[in-house]
From Swiss-Prot:
Catalytic activity field: N-terminal glycyl-[protein] + tetradecanoyl-CoA = N-tetradecanoylglycyl-[protein] + CoA + H(+)
Top-level taxon of the source organism: Eukaryota
Record family assignment: Belongs to the NMT family.
Disulfide-bonded cysteines: none
Keywords: Acyltransferase, Transferase
Protein name listed in UniProt: Putative glycylpeptide N-tetradecanoyltransferase 2
């Protein structure tokens, strides 16, 4: 089970981060076909570990007799294995206390140096960001699981989860949201990942929680759905200068900059930063909006306070307030991640914004997201990411987003859906 708020944020801690490679597809019209063929090849591969887990299997796709719901029934907590799984002799389990500044610094360095994404790109997660992503209200410290070398005490692996509520059809299910799975790059052949997943699963069950949600850039089993990541350049000159994209054919730098230029200020009347007093209204907007999706996050006021109230350098949220009624009518948000750019004399970091959730009722969705692009540009972001879940597909091309090759596969652990979903049927904010 893996994914991140730290990716995106969002699989490195990942989880709250998506791929920051901005190399655009050469042929947008054929990309879907190519991706489809690649996925078919991946589907044919077997994953021995996941074939032993209570997850949806490809062999069951045509079996209409299988019911929706839990794959394995819950048991008594007293029947759950009480002792941790055994590690190889030179390793030991540890709890990662994110309230400790020293632990946060160690985690920062570990994730930065061992991100499973592009080796040339290093994600930067401040201690404030790590605590926001990993320690929401009601979190379990025992779910922040590390592996150390016994002799040196060096951290060499990390997995974590947090409790959440996810509505599947008409049922709200308590689940674990798996935020991150990261193993030291030199130890990935030691078989640690499956063991860490089993250990986290054991600890989740000890809290009487029997389902989980996670994402991965890899095909592990049959996904609930698969989304594609899209990118919108905010600072094209910088992105071209650092080599993350290039000028398109017959385009000059000045024409490219002009193509992606945004207004100096948001254009929607009543658009302002979200405040604490807006929490009940934003919660109501979110719950109403997410009710249309087959699988969605179940938000309450406490969730909104933690995940969506603005925090500098972490999450940015905005509302539209009607000038006539003074009601909150629309909402948009994005979180951020900084990336180290090695070997560039002019730039050392890239600032990335990731769309969280956009709810448009009186404002058009494209105008609302365009305002989000404007304020993210004002805040100094260089690039803006979004995936084609929920209703996002409706604005992507209009606002000059371009598709990336990277995809995110969404999974439910110990829960079966009879049919896979379209990305537009998914309302998970992970």
């Amino acid at each position: 089970m893996s994914d991140p708020k730290l990716k995106p944020v969002e699989d490195a801690l990942v989880t709250v981060a998506k791929s920051s490679q901005i190399q655009l597809a050469k042929d947008d019209t054929s990309g879907g076909t190519i991706v489809g063929r690649l996925l078919q090849c991946q589907y044919s591969k077997t994953h021995k570990f996941w074939e032993t887990q209570p997850v949806e299997q490809f062999k069951d796709i045509q079996d209409t007799s299988l019911p929706e719901g839990p794959i394995e029934p819950a048991t008594l907590v007293s029947e759950v294995k009480q002792e941790p799984y055994n590690l190889l002799g030179q390793f030991e389990w540890t709890i990662c206390d994110m309230n400790s500044d020293d632990m946060c610094l160690e985690m920062y360095n570990f994730l930065k140096e061992n991100s499973p994404d592009d080796q040339q790109i290093k994600y930067e997660y401040s201690k404030e960001y790590l605590r926001w992503a990993l320690c929401p209200p009601g979190y379990y410290q025992s779910w922040h699981i590390g592996v150390r070398v016994k002799t040196s005490k060096k951290l060499i692996a990390f997995i974590c989860g947090r409790p959440t509520r996810i509505r599947v059809r008409d049922e709200v299910v308590k689940m674990a949201k798996v935020n991150s799975l990261c193993v030291h790059k030199k130890l990935r052949s030691k078989g640690l990942a499956p063991l860490m997943i089993k250990e986290l699963t054991r600890r989740v069950k000890l809290q009487n929680i029997w389902q989980a949600a996670y994402t991965s850039s890899h095909i592990l089993s049959r996904p609930v759905t698969t989304s594609r990541d899209w990118v919108r350049m905010l600072n094209p000159k910088k992105l071209i200068d650092v080599g993350l994209t290039r000028l398109r054919d017959r385009m000059t730098m000045s024409r490219t900059v002009k193509l992606y230029k945004l207004p100096d200020a948001p254009i929607t009347p009543g658009f302002r930063e979200m405040e604490r007093r807006d929490v009940p209204a934003v919660t109501a907007l979110l719950r109403n909006y997410l009710s249309q999706f087959a699988v969605a996050t179940d938000f309450d006021d406490n969730d909104v306070k933690h995940w969506l109230l603005p925090r500098e350098n972490i999450v940015y949220s905005y509302v539209v307030v009607s000038p006539e009624t003074h009601d909150v009518t629309d909402f948009c948000s994005f979180c951020n991640s900084s990336i180290t750019i090695p070997g560039n004399r002019k730039y050392t970091t890239l600032e990335c914004a990731y769309a969280c959730c956009n709810v448009a009722t009186l404002t058009s969705l494209s105008q609302l997201v365009n305002d989000a692009l404007i304020v993210s540009k004002q805040k100094g972001f260089d690039v803006f990411y979004a995936s084609d879940v929920m209703q996002n597909e409706s604005f992507l091309k209009e606002l000059r987003f371009y598709p990336l090759c990277r995809q995110s596969h969404y999974y439910l652990y110990n829960y079966r859906l009879r049919n896979a979903l379209k990305p537009s049927e998914l309302g998970l904010i992970l």
